[in-house]
């Protein structure tokens, strides 16, 4: 565990002390090295928990997310080079340092076996994200987006702290393996019901559940590209991961608590997919599609069967890769046309023909075309939901149909059509951007061959 955390922390002096010329190269290469070392976590082990220390441990649920978070640091650094090139050197250092500071906290959050440590690292990721959005966003609205992000997350996570303390007074420990072994039965009272609700609520806002999702499109639209990638690929997954961890602790008080959340998540998947069909802003469209996919993850985590957990796990990883790739593609368009409006950036296929290949691949994975892992995940979740209650197939089926519709709408409106007259000169796509897209696509394609690496089954 430490052989990843310590080098990640040492990236900070690397970024601060590197000479101006080689700063980007040093940080990117070093973080890629850390990412490739982290791949060995995926080796299957006989024991349910790998590398168990007093405060961290990894099992089937956290390992894929940990590898994903290590994989995304070099990608975020690579994606940010374009829009930071005109900034003073000191600000570039600050930007890279902010990205690096988030990383140990995310790794701690995914590997913590102690609920209090999990809470602290869960909250600590918020501040650097806020700095990224409010300092490096493009429009003045970034300040209101930052306030939305801060208040939604803080208001929901204060009750989480209280309910963790309540759990501690009742069980005497917050160590997850011990809690799992002892199966503490909380007394069936109003306080335990409220505390289980508070435990769930913080993660529902982070995931986000439909109705509590208003901070997400704002944050995505106003964030710089690294902020969008971080939110889509890692911070939303903290919500899904927290739900998976916490639902196993709250039996049997909260069983009937799951019904409203399940219904709302599935209804939200349907509603946000239909909202996507009416979007004019490209980044906003991708952000709403994230809400729709995470709705399925929440619904699956609420059922708590092996199949549904497995489906939720695969969907979280594949959605992280897909939506991050879509944000990168949207950013390459934005850097050339300086507009996110779909009508003003249409018909780019003749100008950037190779980029349209990436657009096609990203959109096909987003609409869960076979044989992608997105399809495996959606099928697994649908089967689990159908097994639990057959009418859910109406909601999930319609949501899938709408997903395909808005994905095709996004592809056709960005790539096809007549070129707007105001786009006169477009810089060519460069190697860095193609490498960035390739490093998103390679994990997607390799996971098709071996999806059991990410189909975490809670042991």
From Swiss-Prot:
One of its GO terms (molecular function) is NADH dehydrogenase (ubiquinone) activity. GO terms for cellular component: mitochondrial inner membrane; respiratory chain complex I. It catalyses: a ubiquinone + NADH + 5 H(+)(in) = a ubiquinol + NAD(+) + 4 H(+)(out). GO terms for biological process: aerobic respiration; electron transport coupled proton transport; mitochondrial electron transport, NADH to ubiquinone; mitochondrial respiratory chain complex I assembly. Its EC number is 7.1.1.2. Signal peptide: none annotated. Keywords: Electron transport, Membrane, Mitochondrion, Mitochondrion inner membrane, NAD, Respiratory chain, Translocase, Transmembrane, Transmembrane helix, Transport, Ubiquinone. The chain crosses the membrane at residues 28-48, 60-80, 100-120, 147-167, 197-217, 224-244, 256-276, 285-305, 309-329, 341-361, 384-406. The keyword Mitochondrion applies. Its main location: mitochondrion. It is found in: Mitochondrion inner membrane. It is a multi-pass membrane protein. Belongs to the complex I subunit 4 family. Core subunit of the mitochondrial membrane respiratory chain NADH dehydrogenase (Complex I) which catalyzes electron transfer from NADH through the respiratory chain, using ubiquinone as an electron acceptor. Essential for the catalytic activity and assembly of complex I. Core subunit of respiratory chain NADH dehydrogenase (Complex I) which is composed of 45 different subunits. This is NADH-ubiquinone oxidoreductase chain 4. The lineage of its organism: Eukaryota, Metazoa, Chordata, Craniata, Vertebrata.
């Amino acid at each position: 565990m430490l052989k990843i955390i310590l080098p990640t922390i040492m990236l900070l002096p690397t970024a601060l002390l590197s000479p101006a010329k080689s700063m980007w190269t040093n940080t990117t290469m070093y973080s890629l090295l850390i990412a490739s070392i982290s791949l060995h976590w995926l080796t299957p082990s006989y024991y349910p928990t790998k590398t168990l220390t007093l405060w961290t441990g990894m099992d089937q649920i956290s390992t894929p997310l940990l590898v994903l978070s290590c994989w995304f640091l070099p990608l975020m650094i690579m994606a940010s080079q374009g829009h930071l090139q005109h900034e003073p050197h000191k600000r570039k250092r600050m930007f890279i340092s902010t990205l690096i500071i988030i990383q140990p906290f995310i790794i701690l959050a995914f590997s913590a076996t102690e609920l209090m440590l999990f809470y602290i690292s869960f909250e600590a990721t918020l501040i650097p994200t806020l700095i990224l959005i409010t300092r490096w966003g493009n429009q003045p609205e970034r300040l209101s987006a930052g306030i939305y992000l801060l208040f939604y997350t803080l208001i929901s996570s204060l009750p989480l702290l209280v309910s963790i303390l309540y759990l501690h007074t009742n069980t005497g420990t917050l160590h997850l393996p011990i809690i799992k072994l002892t199966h503490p039965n909380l007394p069936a009272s109003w306080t335990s019901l409220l505390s289980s609700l508070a435990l769930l609520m913080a993660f529902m806002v982070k995931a986000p559940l439909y109705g509590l999702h208003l901070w997400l499109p704002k944050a995505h639209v106003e964030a710089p590209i690294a902020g969008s990638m971080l939110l889509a690929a890692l911070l939303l997954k903290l919500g899904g991961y927290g739900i998976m961890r916490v639902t196993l602790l709250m039996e049997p008080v909260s069983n009937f608590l799951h019904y409203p959340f399940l219904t709302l998540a599935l209804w939200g998947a349907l509603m946000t997919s239909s909202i996507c069909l009416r979007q004019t802003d490209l980044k906003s469209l991708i952000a709403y599609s994230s809400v729709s996919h995470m709705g399925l993850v929440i619904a699956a985590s609420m059922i708590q069967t092996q199949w549904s957990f497995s489906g939720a796990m695969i969907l979280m990883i594949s959605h992280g890769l897909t939506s991050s790739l879509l944000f990168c593609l949207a950013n390459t368009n934005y850097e050339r046309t300086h507009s996110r409006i779909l009508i003003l950036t249409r018909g780019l296929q003749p100008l950037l023909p190779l980029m349209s290949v990436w657009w096609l691949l990203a959109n096909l994975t987003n609409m869960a075309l076979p044989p992608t892992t997105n399809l495996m995940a959606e099928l697994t979740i649908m089967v689990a939901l159908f097994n639990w209650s057959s009418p859910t197939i109406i909601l999930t089926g319609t949501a899938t149909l709408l997903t395909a519709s808005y994905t095709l709408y996004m592809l056709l409106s960005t790539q096809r059509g007549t070129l707007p007259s105001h786009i006169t000169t477009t810089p060519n796509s460069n190697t860095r951007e193609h490498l960035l897209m390739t490093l998103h696509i390679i994990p997607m394609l390799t996971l098709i061959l071996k999806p059991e690496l990410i189909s975490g089954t809670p042991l």
